[in-house]
Amino acid sequence: MKIGLMGGTFNPIHMAHLRIAEEARELCGLDRVLFIPVADPPHKPLAGEVPFHQRCQMVRLAIAGNRAFELSEIEGQRPGKSYSIDTIGTFREQHPQAELYFIIGSDSFLELGLWRRYADILRSCNLIVVERPGRQVNDPLSALPVDIRGELRYTPASRSLEHVGGTRVHFFAGCLLDISSSEIRRLAATGRSITYLVPPQVEAYIKEQRIYSECP
């Protein structure tokens, strides 16, 4: 079984998140894609301090009806900061025979060297790096810290990095939807429409709960 892991604050989840997950599922033949809201982001504070349960509910509403998409609340079940390597490790224990694919954006890949135990992430699962318009990764090896480069080989034809342990990093230019959660929060806070930026059921929930009514 191939399982995609897509983490994020999902504050809120929007149409580009869903499209990225669908393109990744199709590209790598994933059987399932798990959406994993971050409980306590390790690198920057959560904008607006939207509670974990509300962000989970927005994801739940957004993916309803898609049998390949699932919500995982695993990071809300652990104390402390939400580190990706811990989440990957838990799924590895739960699904020892599965192929895991960690889905991230190209901006996150370019900062991977700042992540906790980034080398173990590359060694323990496959990565799908989604390149947004204007954010291409032209030289993947050079983007990584020197101490890990010797374990990887880049194949231009397939646009992938192969780790000596067998895992791969796949790069693809996906999702032309240029949508940001921060812009959605700004629009919602000022009473502007967010229709077609988020699924209708998510928009209704945001309005009902007044989630971003006081967001900066």
Curated annotation (Swiss-Prot):
Keywords of the record: ATP-binding, NAD, Nucleotide-binding, Nucleotidyltransferase, Pyridine nucleotide biosynthesis, Transferase
Reactions mediated catalytically: nicotinate beta-D-ribonucleotide + ATP + H(+) = deamido-NAD(+) + diphosphate
SUPFAM superfamilies linked to this entry: Nucleotidylyl transferase
Keyword NADP (UniProt): no
Enzyme Commission number(s) of this protein: 2.7.7.18
MF terms (GO), sorted A to Z: ATP binding; nicotinate-nucleotide adenylyltransferase activity
Database matches in Pfam families: CTP_transf_like
GO process terms (BP): NAD biosynthetic process
Oxidoreductase recorded as keyword: no
Pathway where this protein functions: Cofactor biosynthesis; NAD(+) biosynthesis; deamido-NAD(+) from nicotinate D-ribonucleotide: step 1/1
Similarity remark: Belongs to the NadD family.
Function text: Catalyzes the reversible adenylation of nicotinate mononucleotide (NaMN) to nicotinic acid adenine dinucleotide (NaAD).
Designated name of the protein: Probable nicotinate-nucleotide adenylyltransferase
Organism: Pelobacter propionicus (strain DSM 2379 / NBRC 103807 / OttBd1)
